[in-house]
């Protein structure tokens, strides 16, 4: 829903959206490549506005569940920005004093059910991408009778776009570092079944004002979940950055790579590759796809950089580099930071992380996952449904193997079998929904204090403050884990050797690192997280920003 600070409007269905113009020239000039059909969900008929607004007056109309009042959790401070849908404020968490940005969206501005769905999906996608070091972190969402409030990480360093304007263009070294961040976000989105659809320099903010500050991707208001092979037709995005297949209403995630290629061109030259005095003139230039590498500063730019841009801006999309291939391009990885092997999808890294956990931790994660909100789980729910091809409610080995292949994995069969065994906590031979969610949801959701307290209380049935052998045996029976060595679990977690597990020992077990994915997509093993951190995800090092 618009910019991080401005709360601008960008509904995929709004008839007044500036992106939805007459693309007659596309059909006249490119009839073989343009299509008006789509597998994307149709908006269908609209309900009367008055009836729609009456429904929105409920404090659960958008999120679908009750939330605490925003001002019970945060104090709201100065205004940071304002746009068509609402206002962004500085807010301070009452319990910790930590500062965040709060985007308050006026429900009266949501004129259709499609607008409501856009807000709901934006929140779901932000939760789904949580933990990536270059994606702004959502802290929570709140709803009352008048507003939906999205509380997120505060980024005070300004827009990447402003940095481009200030400098005209970046050095190639700096541009390559920024490219790694931007395309790393694209790769992470695609591996999690998300298409961004509105990448642009304005949607990347600097965390702080320092020159070495990290970049954070914001604004997922136009982003959508996609399945491999799915085709979309709604024309969205920003004129300078939109891919030709989007104008032709027949596109997939490859469009994000085109958009990233446009950003790389701007980083190196200070001007967009497709420019005209009018919006339709811009679209015409996009469809022609002619690149200017003759004007300044291009004669001084390396051939490697120009090769990358050409390959990112190829049409048709099937000839374009994937996000992973961009990260492996020599211009991007000249300093050795870019990955030297295919990136496993982020979900795959989480499965590997899960496989290193003991059985008590796996049970605890299942307990926590069951209590996560719908918007936190929506993305993983879609991935589960995509893998569960026979809709049986459980993923078989063959379904897991095929699903991982479609999401970009090239694991050997033995490795997939290991992941299957790790996720199949009850040893039924399949992965049910609870097991899938527990194995793939990012740990920053699972390590929050309220979740840990609830999970500990689940095991500590008598409220004594300790998990005993009897209570652990009871929990194992509930989870169909009859073969678990109770004594071994107690011995592993019980740090003071009193034969039981207190809350501190339980938290230490839950926060102990196993395998994590770092900003450039590579896996590190045995990397512990600190007990005081709310977000166990690592940050991108200065060499990879």
Curated annotation (Swiss-Prot):
It is found in: Membrane. Ca(2+) 3 binds at residues 460, 462, 464, 466, 471. InterPro entries: CDPK_Ser/Thr_kinases, EF-hand-dom_pair, EF_Hand_1_Ca_BS, EF_hand_dom, Kinase-like_dom_sf, Prot_kinase_dom, Protein_kinase_ATP_BS, Ser/Thr_kinase_AS. It is a lipid-anchor. Activated by calcium. Autophosphorylation may play an important role in the regulation of the kinase activity. Belongs to the protein kinase superfamily. Ser/Thr protein kinase family. CDPK subfamily. PANTHER family: SERINE/THREONINE-PROTEIN KINASE. This is Calcium-dependent protein kinase 6. It comes from Oryza sativa subsp. japonica. The gene is CPK6.
């Amino acid at each position: 829903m618009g910019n991080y600070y401005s709360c601008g409007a960008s509904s995929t269905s709004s008839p007044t959206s500036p992106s939805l113009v007459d693309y007659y020239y596309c059909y006249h000039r490119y009839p073989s490549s343009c299509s008006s059909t789509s597998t994307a969900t149709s908006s269908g008929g609209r309900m009367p506005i008055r009836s729609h607004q009456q429904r929105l007056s409920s404090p659960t109309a958008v999120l679908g569940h009750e939330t605490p009042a925003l001002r019970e959790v945060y104090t709201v401070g100065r205004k940071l920005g304002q746009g068509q849908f609402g206002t962004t404020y500085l807010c301070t968490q009452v319990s910790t004093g930590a500062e965040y940005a709060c985007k308050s969206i006026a429900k009266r501005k949501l004129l259709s059910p499609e607008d409501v769905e856009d807000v709901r999906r934006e929140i779901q996608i932000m939760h789904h991408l949580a933990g990536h070091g270059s994606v702004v972190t959502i802290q929570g969402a709140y709803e009352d009778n008048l507003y939906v409030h999205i509380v997120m990480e505060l980024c005070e360093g300004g827009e990447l776009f402003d940095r481009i304007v200030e400098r005209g263009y970046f050095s190639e070294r700096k541009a390559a570092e920024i490219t790694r961040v931007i395309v790393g976000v694209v790769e992470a989105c695609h591996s999690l079944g998300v298409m961004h659809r509105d990448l642009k320099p304005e949607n990347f903010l600097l965390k702080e004002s320092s020159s070495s500050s990290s970049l954070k991707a914001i604004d997922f208001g136009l982003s959508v979940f996609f399945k491999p092979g799915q085709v979309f037709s709604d024309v969205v995005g920003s004129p300078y950055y939109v891919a030709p297949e989007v104008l032709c209403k027949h596109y997939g995630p490859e469009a994000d790579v085109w958009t990233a290629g446009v950003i790389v061109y701007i980083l190196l030259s200070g001007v967009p590759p497709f420019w005209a005095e009018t919006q339709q003139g811009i679209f015409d230039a996009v469809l022609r796809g002619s690149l200017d590498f003759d004007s300044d500063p291009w004669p001084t730019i390396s051939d490697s950089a120009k090769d990358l841009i050409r390959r990112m801006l190829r049409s048709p999309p099937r000839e374009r580099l994937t996000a992973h291939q961009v990260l492996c391009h020599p211009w991007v990885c000249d300093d050795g930071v870019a990955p030297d092997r295919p990136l496993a999808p982020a979900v795959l890294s989480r499965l590997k992380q899960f496989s290193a956990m003991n059985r008590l931790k796996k049970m605890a994660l299942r307990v926590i996952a069951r209590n996560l909100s719908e918007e936190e789980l929506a993305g993983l729910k879609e991935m589960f449904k995509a893998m569960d091809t026979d809709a049986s409610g459980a993923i078989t080995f063959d379904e897991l193997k095929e699903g991982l292949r479609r999401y970009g994995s090239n694991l050997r069969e033995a490795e997939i079998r290991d992941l299957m065994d790790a996720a199949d906590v009850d040893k039924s031979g399949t992965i049910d929904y609870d097991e899938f969610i527990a194995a793939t949801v990012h740990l920053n959701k699972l390590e929050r204090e309220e979740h840990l307290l609830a999970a500990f209380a689940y095991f500590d049935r008598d409220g004594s403050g300790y998990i005993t052998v009897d209570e652990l045996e009871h929990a194992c029976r509930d989870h169909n884990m009859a073969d678990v060595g109770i004594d071994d679990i107690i011995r592993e977690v019980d740090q003071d050797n009193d034969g039981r597990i207190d809350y501190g020992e339980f938290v230490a077990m839950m926060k102990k690192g196993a395998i994590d994915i770092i900003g450039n997509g590579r896996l590190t093993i045995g990397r512990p997280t600190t007990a005081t951190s709310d977000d166990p995800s690592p940050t991108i090092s200065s060499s990879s920003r």
